[in-house]
Swiss-Prot record:
InterPro entries: SAM-dependent_MTases_sf, tRNA_(Gua-N-7)_MeTrfase_Trmb, tRNA_methyltr_TrmB_bact. It catalyses: guanosine(46) in tRNA + S-adenosyl-L-methionine = N(7)-methylguanosine(46) in tRNA + S-adenosyl-L-homocysteine. It comes from Legionella pneumophila (strain Lens). The keyword Chaperone does not apply. This is tRNA (guanine-N(7)-)-methyltransferase. PROSITE patterns: SAM_MT_TRMB. GO terms for cellular component: tRNA methyltransferase complex. The active site is at 131. Belongs to the class I-like SAM-binding methyltransferase superfamily. TrmB family. Keywords: Methyltransferase, S-adenosyl-L-methionine, Transferase, tRNA processing. One of its GO terms (molecular function) is tRNA (guanine(46)-N7)-methyltransferase activity. Catalyzes the formation of N(7)-methylguanine at position 46 (m7G46) in tRNA. The keyword Phosphoprotein does not apply. Pathway: tRNA modification; N(7)-methylguanine-tRNA biosynthesis. The lineage of its organism: Bacteria, Pseudomonadati, Pseudomonadota, Gammaproteobacteria, Legionellales.
Amino acid sequence: MQRKIKSYVLRAGRISNRQQQGLDLWLEDYELKFDSPSPWNFAKEFGRHDADTIVEIGFGMGTSLFAMAMNNPQCNYLGIEVHKAGVGSLVADLHEYQISNVRVVAHDAVEVLQTKIPENSLAGVQIFFPDPWHKKRHHKRRLIQSEFIQMLVKKIRPSGFIHCATDWEDYAEHILNVLSSESALFNQQKEGGYSPRPDSRPLTKFELRGERLGHGVWDLVFIKK
C-alpha cells in the first residue's frame, strides 16, 4: 500500500506543562522507535509472552486507551498518534498511575503498519472517532478505505477484531460498506449493520456531551475469519 494522501493535518497546537513533561521526562519509558531496523517483537517490547496485543490508531488525548489498559492488564496496548499534545498527555497519565502495558509510537499509522507490525500478530485494532473529513471533496483523506482495511486484515490474527466508532453517520455508512466488502471479515452483528457500544469501549466526555445533545454514535465490530 503506497501512502500518498494523509488522513490528518499536523497543526501547531498549545502543549500544556504536564504534556510537555510527558514528552520530555517519560516518553522514552513507553515509546517504540519507528526508526528501529526491523519489525517489532511484542514479547520483547512489552517484556512478556502470550499477551494479546491491541493497537489503537489515533488515540487523541489517550482517554479511552488509558482506561482500557487499566481495565485489562492482561493485554498489551500499542497506541499510534501523531499529535504531540495527545502523546504527552497519555504518557503523563501512564507515568502517574504506573501503567506498564501500554507502548506508544508517534508516527503515521499507515507507515507503522506497513513496516513495523508483523503479520497475524494483533488480537485487534481499534479506531475511535477518526477525522470524518466531512466535506465531500475531502473524503479521499478518510483513513478507512478498502486498501487500508486489506492491510489491517493481514496484521490481525484469525478471530481478531477491527472495532471502529464514529459520530458522523455518513462516515459510519462508508465504514460499514468498506468492512462488509472485505471477504476476510464478518460482522459481529449477525443481522448486519451496527453494533451496540461494547462495554470494553469507555464513554468519553466528548461522547457524553454529544449524547446529551442528541448526537448519534455508531460502533462497528468485524472479526477476521
